[in-house]
Amino acid sequence: MSGSRKQEAIDELRNSLDVPADTAQSVLESFNWDVQEAIESLTGESSRVDRNSKLGLSFGVFQSVFSLLFSGLHKLWMILSRVPLISTFIPIFGTTKRVLSPADTANKLVQNLEEQYGTEHIDFFTDGGYMEALTRIKRNYGVALLFFTSSKNDDSETFSRSVLMNQELKEFLNRRNILCWTGDVCEDEAFRGSRQFHCTKFPSAVLVMYSPQLSELVVAAQLHGCLDSSSIITNLTNALAKHLPSLERFRSEREAREAARELRRQQDNAYQASLARDRERQAFARAEEERLAKEKEEREIVQKKKKQYRAWLASNLPPEPSSEDEPARLSIRFPDGSRAVRRFKKDDTVESVYNYVDYMLFEKEEPEEFGRATSSSNPVTPPSDYKHDFHFQLYSSLPRALLKPSVAISTNKAIFPNGTVVVELDD
């Protein structure tokens, strides 16, 4: 058939039933471009012409006249529809239908159903078309009931009111977690679905479920033609009794496997968390051990340098100045109650007094080290990278005041020209 003849067939079907162009093309392709068969498929009126032919000659004449009139009007329609810009002035010739997604189409159908009959209908899947519904039940190992209806069929209103709005059927489907989808075969996707499931009469109901034996979806039941809720429930009950036990066993086994897998996952997570805590504790213990070892090593280094410094100080203590130099004469009282009297240069700072006290304490605290430092003929050098900290404080007696190492002796009247110094050890 030529392209122009095909277009004429599409236009004729659309003018007769007002279906979208893509749906009209799909239907006509399925019926080898026979417009009459396509109309009968969508309306279910295959025997109407035969019945009408029995009404007598008068009706036959009327039919012939009507056919001629319709043919003439159709040709005029075809000519006008091809005139450029005609749709701009006469909107009826324009193609204004918007192509909807499967989800939008499903939602539109349910919305129309609610506008006509109310909201107490079967719970429908509206996230997509019938393919999305089948994908979902395959993923979830479930059951789906697909309704294929035709808005051009005389039984459409009765079916919608008595079946799609039936509360007993709704409860039956909900109790068994059956996913429901409905589509109008005057829309392209629903028509393709009806052809896939070989639905030749409308409305049709197709029960699809996952088969554990085949690992794929199978058709468990099909109902065509005049349907009522009780017959649907009866047929679904029989089909489910035959196929559902194996599916439920499969689901139970699958749930048991998933529960065992989840338990193993939780146990593994708990074990890994325990290992992580152990590693964290071990890492903390190692870090603490390393810190303590480092601090000990640093203290030992400082202590070693301190001994070296005190040994150097002991071997290099300056002699007492003579009386002619007008020195400061200080009486030094130690924590053990002992006293020492010594002269210091008036131009020296109080640090020289601190050095002398450290010298005396070194002798008291570490006599062996002190003896080696003062008796050795080998010169002792001060340690590098070391700042000596005195482990005591010096105070004047009257008035009691802290003596700072950096202050000149001659500027402090409490110790110059003479005075008493008290030694207090740090805690």
Curated annotation (Swiss-Prot):
Pfam families: UBX. Residues 247-311 form a coiled coil. GO terms for molecular function: ubiquitin binding; ubiquitin protein ligase binding. GO terms for biological process: ERAD pathway; positive regulation of cellular response to hypoxia; proteasome-mediated ubiquitin-dependent protein catabolic process; SREBP signaling pathway. InterPro entries: Thioredoxin-like_sf (IPR036249), UAS (IPR006577), Ubiquitin-like_domsf (IPR029071), UBX_dom (IPR001012), UBX_domain-protein (IPR050730). It comes from the Eukaryota. Keywords: Coiled coil, Endoplasmic reticulum, Ubl conjugation pathway. Signal peptide: none annotated. This is UBX domain-containing protein 10. It comes from Schizosaccharomyces pombe (strain 972 / ATCC 24843). The lineage of its organism: Eukaryota, Fungi, Dikarya, Ascomycota, Taphrinomycotina.
